[in-house]
UniProtKB/Swiss-Prot annotation:
Keyword Ligase: yes
Protein name: Tyrosine--tRNA ligase
GO cellular component: cytosol
Quaternary context: Homodimer.
Residues binding ATP: K234
One Gene Ontology biological process: tyrosyl-tRNA aminoacylation
Positions of the S4 RNA-binding domain: 359-416
Domain of life: Bacteria
Amino acid sequence: MSMGILDELDWRGLIAQSTDRETLANDLANGPMTVYSGFDPTAPSLHAGHLVPLLTLRRFQRAGHRPIVLAGGATGMIGDPRDTGERTLNTADTVADWAGRIRGQLERFVEFDDTPTGAIVENNLNWTGRLSAIEFLRDLGKYFSVNVMLDRETVRRRLEGDGISYTEFSYMLLQANDFVELHQRYGCALQIGGSDQWGNIVAGARLVRQKLGATVHAMTTPLVTDSEGKKFGKSTGGGNLWLDPEMTSPYAWYQYFVNTADADVIGYLRWFTFLSADEIAELEDATQNRAHERAAQKRLARELTTLVHGEGATTAVELASQALFGRAELADLDESTLGAALREASNGQVAELKPGGPDSIVDLLVETGLAASKGAARRNVAEGGVYVNNIRIESDEWIPQHSDFLHERWLVLRRGKRHIAGVERVGA
């Protein structure tokens, strides 16, 4: 079973680096291993980029090992050095609030029970918050060579630019100490993180060996980019794709993955789903021979939306996708799903219809950007290509009535088969 997890991670392409592979394999084979990954609360929510380490923890649990998900309530107040410069320090209350929210998200990805593989959630503020300056310098700092710390690539680049604060420079020590604490408390023997964390993770394994005389392991997963080299998990507007449905709607989340390029979708299925090799091979064949069906993309979107938001949200999103384009009933959508779907389908540009404002179909087509001019709008109507709530509009003098508004608030405008826009009635 334990050797199987490394084999599975290999074929899925999920191992970027690791400490001695043979020793790790032997230790995994000798019984359940406790494995951890840490997540700093640098925002109110985790984002899609966190999925790889999160799902890797889940894979270890399914293979018979015990996962620890660590919320960085302390390290989140410091900030891991990054290339773009010094981080803005958030208040302790803000970080605590974010850590609480993130903890709830972390708990969705692993199983909690009373078995030897039942997951644990920790917060490094529990031990770092009690660490005095003297203890930090004597019990941690003594084990770290400044020469080695300066050799870290991110630190080097920062020193070549505007420099780096001692606060961020010391981050490595605090993360390394997390490994010591988790080993002492739970026997944790493996830390997992993104490949940009390799230096910090190895430093932790080294500190465990130096302070406790124990051998522990380090493993990193690849940083995910698409076939064009762009960072994974960025929305159309360039922002993060958040796991919090209030920050990224389930509809927007689903649409991101259903629009995955053919060149990326099979890799994403390996990294982000628990589908078997045979199932993925079938979807790969479908992509190569029947790409127009987009079977792999639809399966990817369904798996990940269900994983993050639940089966009910996935069903609602798929119904919304069909309804917007005339393949299902708009009236069956709840208001929140309809509103989110409209905003996403129209790139966030939902026109407002105020009392007494221009409200003919011609005005609405121009206002929403579905027509460049009133003349173009009239031609679109005359050609039979304009729909409101999936009903074809026959006259360019059409004006919406109260009964036309879905949930007494929304109109769904469509030009042709693909161009969607929303109208929201306000102040009525």
